């Protein structure tokens, strides 16, 4: 019971440091202290206190490490993993689209090109920088352009959720081992798993991979994790799926009803009848809710789910996210870059990849 209580304490502490939903977290404080690179010596755009404004925010050692990891992995993946994707997620507001679909009402419009371009400017991971020992700063774009075609460029927003679960799972596992556990499996948020040793009967730890085309409890496969040592598993997926089961999206005045035959359940038929589509260069722009942070638009990779086993939960999380956007990413190259940054041996392997159904 002592191990369980200690692990729960780690989860709570990390939540306090990194949750974007807690105003006092270090991530929220960085977001509240977005500093301009323009005149005024980096004065806070959001009116933060003088201990933060213009000088950056001093963070804990763990946050400092996680931020350095985030930037290293953003660079290693060519931006396919991006801890500053928040403005783009807000611009697309897929949660609202999904809510409308579930309610059986017309979907809200997709963002205009100007809105996407403005959000893309605020989503550059280069806006986050380490300006001193454990001191970090988040800046607005420094090109003196405050709007795109009349659309204001939003403030950048950091969110470490893409790798924090993996870090937390590893930390909990390591603590359990340090306290005497001979075998451990830690699962954080259902998508991040860290293991050590074996099960009580000596067999390897196994983890089921959800089937994104099936129901909530459907399993696409089972992964047997390396026995005896430590390993981390991350699964990233399009949990919403193609809205209504078709590759389409509402797009305001440019939209029209989806053409062609309609098949499937009553719910799918109703959704398809209310969906609208936007074309870009002759193709539909919306496959699912996963946004490509490099383009600002939903990814067209044709992948619904990716699972990665790696030597680090942070590495596994970033890779599974990046591969969902671009499955052509050179995994060995990312691993080699990561090993150089951390100074420790690293490994990663894709153990599950589910393609989107065509329909």
Residue ranges of model-derived segments:
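Mature catalytic core of soluble alpha/beta enzymes
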Residues: 1-359
């Amino acid at each position: 019971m002592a191990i369980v209580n200690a692990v729960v304490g780690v989860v709570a502490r990390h939540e306090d440091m990194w949750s974007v939903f807690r105003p006092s977290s270090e991530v929220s404080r960085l977001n509240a202290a977005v500093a301009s690179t323009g005149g005024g010596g980096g004065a806070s755009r959001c009116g933060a206190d003088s201990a933060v404004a213009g000088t950056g925010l001093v963070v804990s050692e763990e946050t400092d490490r996680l931020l350095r990891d985030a930037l290293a992995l953003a660079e290693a993946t060519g931006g396919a993993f991006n801890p500053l994707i928040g403005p783009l997620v807000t611009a697309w507001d897929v949660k609202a689209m999904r809510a409308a679909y579930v309610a059986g009402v017309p979907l809200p419009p997709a963002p205009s090109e100007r809105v996407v371009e403005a959000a893309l400017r605020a989503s550059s991971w280069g806006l986050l920088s380490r300006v001193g020992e454990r001191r970090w700063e988040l800046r607005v774009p420094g090109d003196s352009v405050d709007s795109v075609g009349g659309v204001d460029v939003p403030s950048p927003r950091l969110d470490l959720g893409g790798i924090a679960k993996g870090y937390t799972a590893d930390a909990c596992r390591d603590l359990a081992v340090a306290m005497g556990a001979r075998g451990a499996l830690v699962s954080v948020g259902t998508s991040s798993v860290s293991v050590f040793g074996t099960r009580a009967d000596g067999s390897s730890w196994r983890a089921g991979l959800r089937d994104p085309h099936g129901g909530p409890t459907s399993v696409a496969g089972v992964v047997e994790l390396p026995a005896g040592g430590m390993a981390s598993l991350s699964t990233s997926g399009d949990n919403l799926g193609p809205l209504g089961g078709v590759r389409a999206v509402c797009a305001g005045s440019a939209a029209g009803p989806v053409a062609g035959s309609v098949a499937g359940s009553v719910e799918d038929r109703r959704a398809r009848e209310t969906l609208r589509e936007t074309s870009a260069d002759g193709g539909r722009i919306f496959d699912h809710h996963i946004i490509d942070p490099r383009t600002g638009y939903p990814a067209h990779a044709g992948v619904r789910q990716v699972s990665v086993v790696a030597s680090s939960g942070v590495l596994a999380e970033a890779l599974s996210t990046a591969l969902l956007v671009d499955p052509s990413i050179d995994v060995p190259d990312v691993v080699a870059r990561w090993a150089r940054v951390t100074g420790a041996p690293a490994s990663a392997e894709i153990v599950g990849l589910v393609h989107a159904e065509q329909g």
